[in-house]
Amino acid sequence: MGKFEAGLDGVTFTSNGCRLLGGFYKAAGAAPRPTAVLLHGLPGIEKHLDIAYRLRDLGWNCLYFHFRGCWGSEGRFSLAGLADDTRAAVEWVLKQQSVDKGRIALIGASTGSHPALICGGADPRIRAIVGVSPLIEPRAFQFPGEMAEEFAGMLNGITGQDLREQWQALPSPADSLGAFAPRPILLVAADKDAIFPPSYYADSVAKLANVQLIRNEESDHGFSACRSWLAQTVTDWLAAVFSEESSKSQ
């Protein structure tokens, strides 16, 4: 197989009949590369593409995409559809020649951490999961009506009331703890996060024996003041996890 060149391709793929839009950051290398799928939050203003750039610089491919009903992707937005869209993204990644199919990770931010945990925990092809300011226990957060209306205004086919009702109906990843058995999980939390503060994670971290929690004392929910730190923390952890897996397989 020839050498892979670094680049960025526009991407479309289908999930439940909806055409989803995204981009594929391609890393250079002589062999298929480890690959991450990056899942944005709600409504997805922060795309966390600095993590994608750093991953590519370190020899990783990275797919980012927009869930149905937001940022140009077709369909009506629904929280229940996040997991289906994530599965479709994973299937797209696994068809790419430049992807090492034994080294796939999911990185979810805020609400995007929910499908990362749900899908990553159930799919043995996913070898590691990262949650940044992650949604772990939906029913432990009371979605403010004003916030729901603001977010719904940026999405297609959903109202603020719909968002709040769908939020309460989301399953908890902690209810399927056994499925996560061999998959290392990193949760990155911010002490100044007004949405999911570190106390929000306490019970879940205690239940998940294979989870590592890293806290930043200075940042908010979006890590606005600590982007370089966040990108390095996530990529260093992924590099260590996959390096350890490679050592065990030799």
Show which residues each predicted segment covers.
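Catalytic histidine-centered segment of alpha/beta-hydrolase-like enzymes
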Residues: 219-230
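Hydrolase active-site cap/lid region
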Residues: 118-163, 183
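Conserved alpha/beta-hydrolase "acid-adjacent" motif
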Residues: 194-200
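N-terminal cap/lid segment of alpha/beta-hydrolase-fold proteins
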Residues: 1-30
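Catalytic nucleophile-loop/oxyanion-hole region of alpha/beta-hydrolase
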Residues: 43, 70-101
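Active-site glycine-rich loops that stabilize anionic/oxyanionic intermediates
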Residues: 33, 40-44
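Conserved alpha/beta-hydrolase
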Residues: 52-74
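Short beta-strand/loop motif that positions the catalytic acidic residue
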Residues: 180-181, 187-189
